[in-house]
Design a protein with these regions (language model features):
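Single conserved hydrophobic/aromatic residue that forms the stacking wall/gate
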Residues: 1-13
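Short internal beta-strands
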Residues: 50-58, 138
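Glycine-rich, charge-decorated loop segments at or immediately adjacent to ligand/cofactor-binding or catalytic sites
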Residues: 61-66, 136-158
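Glycine/threonine-rich flexible loop motifs
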Residues: 109-121
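Conserved anion/nucleotide-ligand pocket segment
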Residues: 157-230
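Glycine-rich, aromatic-lined ligand/substrate-binding cores of catalytic
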Residues: 201-278
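Conserved functional hotspot residues or short segments at active or partner-binding sites
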Residues: 248, 252-350, 368
Length: 368
């Protein structure tokens, strides 16, 4: 077993690239270097940090999914927190962009197309390209970096939960993805930004990396992070995936599902104030006892969604249009309605996976 992966930062504050620059950071509560936050380390070393951009869930990481997080100041340091969304088309405003020279990105991602941190990074890269600002990504391991799975996004479904033509599980770090965005000219108007990536050390795509800090309120443990690519689709259905319980993304159920011995009741909790099926007894399945190895072996497993779909017998009332935004293509819902199995559906996107693996290869910083 090799040494555990570490950040290749060396002493980030000794980097020439940050000298005498006005610095903005894109980070949140996961931006820890050892037991200190990047923001505090930069300030302690007398760097001129002028702004913080914070993603969904806010800078301290405690807001609900999609909740409006207003611009403010960080109470601890007094550094202004700027909105990612105060300008046109979900980008920061020109006034925000003129405040700094270089953007430092340090945030823990989980490597899935519908997990929004990478889309925020892409919007910032686009704004930095437009206003000629440098970007420095302090790379972090991807806990789902050991495989690629799912259909490539059909760009007619581009949205906040799907920003790039990549599979659901892209298997890349944010640094690799940033390089690919530049190299494939994926930013609007084919812009590219001035990008530097500081890679991790002792890391390959087969390194199993356990996150020291939960990346958002409803991904509290590794089991939730491994099951997320299979259970997230319940967000587009009436079925609860365990928000408001101790096992978010690790269970699924509904008051009208029958024939199950397991049940749970969603409650209002921090990070899930008003979860689906709030206060109702839901019958269904607990996946949290499945071994990590079993989850990895299955990759994206649509059998959970298919099981609930068949059990509830709601036909067209089961899926909302959000389903296509999450899965990224129109054939999956059709095949589920036609009675196809999870395996048959997965076979349909196998070519996408192989194609993407070839396409991403030039941008990989770590051995596959």
């Amino acid at each position: 077993r090799d040494r555990s992966p570490s950040r290749g930062l060396g002493d980030v504050y000794k980097r020439q690239i940050l000298k005498n620059k006005r610095i903005a950071i894109f980070s949140n509560h996961t931006g820890m270097i050892g037991d200190k936050h990047l923001l505090d380390i930069l300030l302690e070393n007398k760097f001129n940090v002028v702004a913080i951009f914070s993603p969904e869930h806010g800078f301290r990481g405690d807001a609900d999914a999609g909740e409006h997080v207003s611009s403010s100041v960080d109470k601890k340091t007094g550094v202004p927190i700027l909105s990612l969304y105060d300008g046109k088309s979900g980008k920061p405003s020109e006034a925000s962009m003129r405040k700094f020279d270089i953007l430092v990105v340090d945030i823990q991602d989980v490597g899935l197309r519908f997990y929004t941190y990478y889309a925020s990074m892409c919007r910032l890269m686009d704004a930095c390209a437009e206003y000629n600002r440098k970007v420095l990504i302090l790379d972090r391991p991807n806990p789902n970096g050991h495989y690629v799975d799912g259909p490539i996004l059909d760009m007619k479904y581009k949205s906040g939960v799907g920003w790039l033509p990549i599979p659901v599980v892209h298997g890349m770090t944010l640094g690799e993805l940033g390089l690919m965005v530049n190299g494939e000219r994926w930013l609007p108007a084919s812009r590219t930004c001035d990008l530097t990536v500081i890679p991790c050390k002792n890391y390959t795509h087969q390194t199993l990396y356990k996150l020291p800090i939960p990346p958002s309120p409803n991904l509290p443990n590794m089991k939730s992070i491994y099951l997320y690519p299979s259970t997230c689709y319940f967000e587009a259905t009436p079925v609860s995936l365990g928000r408001g319980t101790d096992l978010p993304f690790q269970v699924y159920g509904h008051p009208n599902m029958t024939g199950y011995s397991y049940s749970f009741t969603p409650r209002s909790v921090p990070g899930a104030k008003n979860p689906p099926q709030l206060g109702k007894l839901c019958h269904g399945v607990n996946l949290s006892n499945m071994s990590d190895e079993e989850i990895w072996k299955r990759g994206i497993d649509l059998s959970y969604v298919i099981d609930a779909y068949r059990n509830l017998n709601m036909d067209d009332h089961f899926f909302r249009s959000f389903f296509e935004l999450l899965i990224g293509t129109d054939y999956v819902r059709k095949m589920i309605k036609e009675g196809k199995s999870a395996e048959e559906i997965k076979a349909r996107w196998k070519d996408d996976v192989e194609k993407f693996k070839v396409q991403r290869k030039p941008y990989l910083l770590y051995e596959e």
